[in-house]
Curated annotation (Swiss-Prot):
InterPro entries the record matches: Ribosomal_Su5_D2-typ_SF, Ribosomal_uS5, Ribosomal_uS5_bac-type, Ribosomal_uS5_C, Ribosomal_uS5_N, Ribosomal_uS5_N_CS, Ribsml_uS5_D2-typ_fold_subgr
Intrachain S-S bonds: none
UniProt organism field: Rhizobium johnstonii (strain DSM 114642 / LMG 32736 / 3841) (Rhizobium leguminosarum bv. viciae)
Annotated keywords: Ribonucleoprotein, Ribosomal protein, RNA-binding, rRNA-binding
NCBIfam families, per the entry: rpsE_bact (TIGR01021)
Protein name: Small ribosomal subunit protein uS5
Annotated Pfam families: Ribosomal_S5, Ribosomal_S5_C
Domain remarks in the Swiss-Prot or TrEMBL record: The N-terminal domain interacts with the head of the 30S subunit; the C-terminal domain interacts with the body and contacts protein S4. The interaction surface between S4 and S5 is involved in control of translational fidelity.
HAMAP family to which the protein is assigned, alphabetical: Ribosomal_uS5_B
UniProt-listed PROSITE patterns: RIBOSOMAL_S5, S5_DSRBD
Keyword RNA-binding: yes
Amino acid sequence: MAQERRPQRDDRQSREERDSEFVDKLVAINRVAKVVKGGRRFGFAALVVVGDQKGRVGFGHGKAREVPEAIRKATEAAKRELIFVPLRDGRTLHHDVHGRHGAGKVLLRSAKVGTGIIAGGPMRAVFETLGMHDVVAKSTGSSNPYNMVRATFDALKHQVHPKDIAAQRGIKYATLQARRSASGNASEE
């Protein structure tokens, strides 16, 4: 029962190719302490956001005794937890959404072309790795980076593509788009 073994180099190359499609941003790094019998044992905790800049994004948390190891663990955790977010024209949200985690609350609004990413701190990292170019975001409550990232992901998970809304309402997607563009033109006048 001889099994065919693939060369290890090929596995490493495919892993590097897979990793190269992602962009990662370090959001926060904290020094943490574990109290043990002999005193305190120090380590580091890292929060990383990973995305492919095409609508997939994830975040991860990692802890280790050394900073690079904590970042590596957080990056691996983020790649395991990717979500897909439908983007309008590949640059902004389809509709405004609210998100919440703990005491952190965020409001994400779609924006016109050329607006840019108007968001603070941890939210900006999420939008940049997601591939979003135009968005306005406001955070209230907790400014803890962990809560802000989780609240942003909560909001992004509530993002619904207009095709899904049209299917739920039992109307054609083109009809929904026509209504949307008609209401958009009326509000600009």
